């Protein structure tokens, strides 16, 4: 992004995190190898599937593998459109692998059908031993991936505003508004099944800050699926502020932009310069959405028992070859070290799916399908803002109105809110 901004980006600059093609197909091949041989020797170990049936572990492992295959197909499709679908075949070295691309629609149908087929074969949250198996693929993860796939499939990029209209390899041949409804219904079903009532097994963590350092439990019901990392302080030492030494030394590798900081609301739920709180350029972080403090380390932030000085040349942004290009550092994903004297080993979970995404996906799909936002759309966004600590306002609308009196946002205004959330 920095090289783009200053005009120094070129074709020789690889964006490693998004240059994917061979790795997903490597995973797909490994899944197919597993599927072709796993039943040769049945497991004696058993598990309980999503329907409560006792089954051999083979069945769960096959379903988990197919989930990963569907996940990586989607990672390909959202970048390239239609890609070759291999199915279950394990190709050998001398076989013809010059397979034609499937259409975008064929790929979406394949991914969704795979997820529908495996959801009952997987285990369901809560798992009996969270510490040992919370990271295992579960039925909620399969359904969450399906919702994400359906939302992408309904989006303008693949429908009414494709890159190349009429090219079925990179989108649908024609727009169908009902695709929004299909995505909304899938998310609604998830919410009603797992996130509603006294026996709900999914929900929002009480504290946004804790989402990325806790796995699923009865107390923390937000995380659906994550990649587990070892207990360490790698994230803190890699991304913590510069200008500190010893056990609280950081390398400041992630520098959030001003655009991201400005995206955080005022604490009344309105965008900066729009609500009752007047945005002060001399005190730009005052009266803001509490999530700002949980996401960004800025000038004046408390961190490792110090007050940060992040202006260029300040104690935590020294001039030289290594400094923060934006005067900001990442806070999100790190442990609670505001008042600590040094970094300690901390659990860091790379969350792939969480309940907050389900609420947002539902709100987006429902809002796009209807001509005006429904109460259910308001409820989804209000739940997120209430958890964040946004003020409820006189009518308990958490800023989701232009006059603090009525539910009067248009579809376009609600779209802006959802996209910002």
Locate the predicted segments by residue.
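An aromatic- and glycine-enriched ligand-binding surface/loop that stacks and positions planar moieties
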Residues: 1-2, 62, 81-83, 108, ...
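Conserved, well-structured interaction surfaces
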Residues: 2-80, 94-134, 281, 286, ...
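Glycine- and aromatic-rich loop/turn segments at beta-sheet edges
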Residues: 43-47, 82-89, 121-130, 198-207, ...
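Short, well-structured active-site flanking segments
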Residues: 77-89, 158, 371-384
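Conserved catalytic neighborhood of penicillin-recognizing serine enzymes
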Residues: 99-114, 384-421
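Carbohydrate-binding/catalytic loop surfaces
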Residues: 207-232, 328-331, 335-337, 399-417
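Active/binding-pocket-proximal capping segment
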Residues: 356-362, 372-401
């Amino acid at each position: 992004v920095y090289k783009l901004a200053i005009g120094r980006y070129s074709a020789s600059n690889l964006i490693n995190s998004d240059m994917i093609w061979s790795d997903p197909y490597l995973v797909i091949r490994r899944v197919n190898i597993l599927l072709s041989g796993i039943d040769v020797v049945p497991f004696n170990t058993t598990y309980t599937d999503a329907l409560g049936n006792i089954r051999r572990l083979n069945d769960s492992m096959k379903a988990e593998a197919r989930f990963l295959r569907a996940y990586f197909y989607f990672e390909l499709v959202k970048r390239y459109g239609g890609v070759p679908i291999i199915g279950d075949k394990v190709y050998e070295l001398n076989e013809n692998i010059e397979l034609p691309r499937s259409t975008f629609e064929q790929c979406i149908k394949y991914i969704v059908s795979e997820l529908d087929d495996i959801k009952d074969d997987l285990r369901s949250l809560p798992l009996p031993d969270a510490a040992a198996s919370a990271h295992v693929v579960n039925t909620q993860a399969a359904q969450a991936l399906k919702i994400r796939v359906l939302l992408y499939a309904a989006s303008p990029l693949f429908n009414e505003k494709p890159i190349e209209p009429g090219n079925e390899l990179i989108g649908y041949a024609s727009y169908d508004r009902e695709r929004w409804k299909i995505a909304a219904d899938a998310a609604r079903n998830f919410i009603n099944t797992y996130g509603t009532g006294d026996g709900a097994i999914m929900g929002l963590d009480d504290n946004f800050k804790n989402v990325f350092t806790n796995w699923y439990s009865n107390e923390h019901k937000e995380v659906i699926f994550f990649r587990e990392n070892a207990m360490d302080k790698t994230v803190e030492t890699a991304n913590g502020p510069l200008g500190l030494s010893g056990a609280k030394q950081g390398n400041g590798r992630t520098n959030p932009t001003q655009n991201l900081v400005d995206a955080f609301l005022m604490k009344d739920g309105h965008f900066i310069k729009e609500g009752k709180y007047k945005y002060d350029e001399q005190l730009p972080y005052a009266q803001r959405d509490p999530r700002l403090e949980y996401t960004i380390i800025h000038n004046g932030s408390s961190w490792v028992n110090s007050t940060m000085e992040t202006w260029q040349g300040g104690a935590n942004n020294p001039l030289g070859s290594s400094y923060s290009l934006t005067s900001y550092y990442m806070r999100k994903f790190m442990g609670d070290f505001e008042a600590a004297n040094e970094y300690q080993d901390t659990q860091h979970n790379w969350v792939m799916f969480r309940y907050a995404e389900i609420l947002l996906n539902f709100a987006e799909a429902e809002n796009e399908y209807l001509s005006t936002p429904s109460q259910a759309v308001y409820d989804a966004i209000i739940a997120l803002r209430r958890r964040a600590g946004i003020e409820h306002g006189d009518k308990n609308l958490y800023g989701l109105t232009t006059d603090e009196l009525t539910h009067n946002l248009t579809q376009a205004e609600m779209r802006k809110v959802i996209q910002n959330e």
